[in-house]
């Protein structure tokens, strides 16, 4: 058997190395992306990928699970310690699957969900009509006010009209802190369960740099990458034993078969990193760097939804500009800066064009960049957007960015 990727499949090997070069020479500023730890990638590339383990630790449907049982047990214990909760399911393959599993466990088809409007910063799985969640359940939405903040009195007003079975508090593009306590008061007032989707800010929560959804949320879901810097995957947490039992059944056998044991091992490794004292410093720096981005871009005349940030991301509104989010995304890409176009409150363009861009600080902070570097980066972003159709200028800035990025290498090899 030929074990070497380079000789076994040169085409894929070369593409992986081209991606390594892109990650090293470009500035990754998509808010949902990050650079995971080499040890996490080692675990993902391990022999655990060969093991089927349907079921849960010590309650499997296959034999030979004595070692993967312990692996999953460690992942669960570390997850509970990180969030200070009683139960954790680490098997969901992704955050979206974690959310769907929660709905399947606790709701009936056509029950009512109240979540954040996608164009105001919510997520597809919070009831958007294009998502299975918006097709299986009756979905209703709250949003932000003209100042870019959630108006909790308005959320309560909507909840009392809708009377949902579940309220979802979470986001994919909201730069401010969520008031989980207030959300719980609203949920209790209408007899609803409260789901906290903290996929974007989980890494800040476990460092004490963002409010903890517990004890306010009945259920919490998150991804394990993004600000946690673990492998791509999902997780469901709760303090309620009866809810935990329903969640476990909804994940397996309800939605998934065999768990990805190599990824669960990688989750455990990532959680181990999150538990280290230095994690708190990383999370603090993520927030500090995002504030620099906000300050510089606003000083250069760009409008930020909510006028700043409390977390790892900023949302730039281009409603007052002649160019779109798609134009900005393309122009910054030409300059070696990767962001994503994003809808904004008051959106006038289609989701494929948009009137905003979402920019995050987590990945570049993982490369060791601090306030000084982020001031330089924010200046370059503004330079590009000030001349959004000048491809020649973007090419020059790309050279500057590539030279700058050399000082902060991501990885020295592509395969672990």
UniProtKB/Swiss-Prot annotation:
Pfam families: SHMT (PF00464)
Superkingdom, natural source: Bacteria
Binding site for (6S)-5,6,7,8-tetrahydrofolate: 118, 122-124, 242, 350-352
Gene3D superfamilies in the cross-refs: Aspartate Aminotransferase, domain 1, Type I PLP-dependent aspartate aminotransferase-like (Major domain)
Cofactors required: pyridoxal 5'-phosphate
GO BP annotations, alphabetical order: glycine biosynthetic process from serine; tetrahydrofolate interconversion
Gene Ontology molecular-function annotations: glycine hydroxymethyltransferase activity; pyridoxal phosphate binding
Subcellular location: Cytoplasm
Pathway linked to the protein: One-carbon metabolism; tetrahydrofolate interconversion; Amino-acid biosynthesis; glycine biosynthesis; glycine from L-serine: step 1/1
Protein biosynthesis found in the keyword field: no
Gene Ontology annotations for the cellular component aspect, listed alphabetically: cytosol
Database matches in NCBIfam families: PRK00011.1 (NF000586)
Function according to Swiss-Prot or TrEMBL: Catalyzes the reversible interconversion of serine and glycine with tetrahydrofolate (THF) serving as the one-carbon carrier. This reaction serves as the major source of one-carbon groups required for the biosynthesis of purines, thymidylate, methionine, and other important biomolecules. Also exhibits THF-independent aldolase activity toward beta-hydroxyamino acids, producing glycine and aldehydes, via a retro-aldol mechanism.
Protein name: Serine hydroxymethyltransferase
Source organism: Wolinella succinogenes (strain ATCC 29543 / DSM 1740 / CCUG 13145 / JCM 31913 / LMG 7466 / NCTC 11488 / FDC 602W)
Lineage: Bacteria, Pseudomonadati, Campylobacterota, Epsilonproteobacteria, Campylobacterales
Gene symbol of the encoding locus: glyA
């Amino acid at each position: 058997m030929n074990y070497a990727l380079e000789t076994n499949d040169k085409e894929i090997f070369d593409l992986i190395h081209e991606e390594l070069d892109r990650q090293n020479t470009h500035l990754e500023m998509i808010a949902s992306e990050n650079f995971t730890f080499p040890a996490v990638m080692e675990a993902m590339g391990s022999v655990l990928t060969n093991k089927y383990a349907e079921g849960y630790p010590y309650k499997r449907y296959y034999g030979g699970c004595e070692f993967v049982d312990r692996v999953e047990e460690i992942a669960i214990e570390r997850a509970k310690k990180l969030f200070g909760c009683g139960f954790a399911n680490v098997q969901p393959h992704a955050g979206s699957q974690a959310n769907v599993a929660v709905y399947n466990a606790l709701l009936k088809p056509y029950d009512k969900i109240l979540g954040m409007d996608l164009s105001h910063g919510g997520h597809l799985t919070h009831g958007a009509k294009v998502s299975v969640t918006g097709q299986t359940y009756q979905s209703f939405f709250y949003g932000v006010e003209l100042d870019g903040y959630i108006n909790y009195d308005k959320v309560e007003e909507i909840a009392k009209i809708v009377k949902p079975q579940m309220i979802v508090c979470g986001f994919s593009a909201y730069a401010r802190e969520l008031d989980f306590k207030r959300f719980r008061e609203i949920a209790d007032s209408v007899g609803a369960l409260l789901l906290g989707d903290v996929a974007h800010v989980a890494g800040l929560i476990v460092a004490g740099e963002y409010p903890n959804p517990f004890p306010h949320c009945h259920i919490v879901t998150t991804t394990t990458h993004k600000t946690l810097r673990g492998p791509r995957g999902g997780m469901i947490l709760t303090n309620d034993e009866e809810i935990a039992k329903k969640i476990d059944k909804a994940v397996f056998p309800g939605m998934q078969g065999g768990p990805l044991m190599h990824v669960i091992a990688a989750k455990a490794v990532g959680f181990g990193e999150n538990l280290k004292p230095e994690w708190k410093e990383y999370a603090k720096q993520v927030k500090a760097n995002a504030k620099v981005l906000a300050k510089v871009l606003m000083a250069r005349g760009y409008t930020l939804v909510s006028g700043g940030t409390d977390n790892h991301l900023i949302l730039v509104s281009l409603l007052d500009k002649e160019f779109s989010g798609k134009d900005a995304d393309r122009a910054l890409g030409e300059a070696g800066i990767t962001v994503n176009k994003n809808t904004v409150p008051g959106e006038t363009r289609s989701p494929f064009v948009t009137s905003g861009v979402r920019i995050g600080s987590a990945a570049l902070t993982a490369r060791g960049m601090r306030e000084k570097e982020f001031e330089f980066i924010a200046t370059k972003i503004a330079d590009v957007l000030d001349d959004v159709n000048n491809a020649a200028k973007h090419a020059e800035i790309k050279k500057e960015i590539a030279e700058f990025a050399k000082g902060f290498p991501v990885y020295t090899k592509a395969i672990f």
